[in-house]
């Protein structure tokens, strides 16, 4: 009896913040700056474990649950948005090798998606700054997801597969955050982790195909 052929990898799905773009450290600095006037701090480790890879909506909810800030959700969003615009206006660095990898994959016929918890305007602005928006065949952003279904839920990667016209078995995810790793694992898509702010905890490392 002939064996079944394994699915052929045809699609690569990228996270953005902390993987392609060096923005997670900026987000950490934003949250630290927001908390400091009220006498609170957040460690880099706690930021990476609690906030990295998640939507701003989820993160603002978590911030207000963890810290007794005299701010409404709307005020918190507004302050973070204003501070981030100042940071991003100064320019954000691409991760080393990111543009070269995207170019290689494009030239070799892979379908490429961006699956980011960011909002579209913010992401497009950053991608256009580096001239890499055209490398992607599909985009999925945080606001595209059902309420409460951002990472670590699998929806963002399953939608990316649908947009690319591929299956989870034919895709590969590149991620840096634990939330993203769990989302890919739950979607039954192999995931490579490229750590940014910290190395994934053992439970998340076990979900990856490899840690680079």
Regions inferred by a protein language model and the residue ranges of each:
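Alpha-helical substrate-recognition element adjacent to the catalytic core
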Residues: 37-68, 73
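Substrate-recognition "cap/lid" segment bordering the active-site pocket of phosphatases
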Residues: 119-172, 178, 182, 186, ...
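Conserved SAM-binding loop
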Residues: 20, 94, 112, 173-174
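Substrate-recognition element of Asp-dependent hydrolases with the DxDx(T/V) motif
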Residues: 31, 98-127, 184
């Amino acid at each position: 009896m002939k064996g079944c052929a394994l699915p052929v990898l045809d699609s690569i799905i990228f996270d953005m913040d902390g993987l392609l773009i060096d923005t997670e450290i900026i987000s950490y600095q934003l949250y630290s700056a927001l908390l400091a006037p009220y006498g609170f701090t957040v460690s880099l480790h706690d930021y990476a474990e609690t906030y990295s890879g998640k939507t701003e909506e989820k993160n603002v909810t978590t911030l207000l649950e963890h810290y007794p800030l005299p701010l409404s959700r709307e005020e918190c969003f507004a302050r973070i948005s204003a501070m981030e615009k100042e940071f991003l206006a100064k320019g954000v660095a691409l991760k080393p090798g990111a543009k070269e990898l995207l170019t290689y994959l494009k030239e070799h016929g892979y379908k490429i998606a961006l699956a980011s918890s960011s909002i579209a305007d913010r992401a497009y602005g950053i991608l256009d700054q580096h001239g890499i928006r055209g490398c992607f065949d599909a985009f999925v952003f945080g606001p595209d997801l059902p309420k409460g279904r951002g990472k670590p839920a699998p929806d963002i990667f399953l939608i990316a597969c649908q947009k690319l016209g591929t299956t989870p078995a034919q895709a590969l995810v590149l991620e840096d955050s634990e939330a993203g790793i769990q989302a890919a694992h739950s979607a039954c898509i192999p995931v490579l982790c490229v750590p940014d702010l910290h190395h994934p905890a053992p439970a998340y490392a076990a979900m990856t195909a490899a840690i680079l």
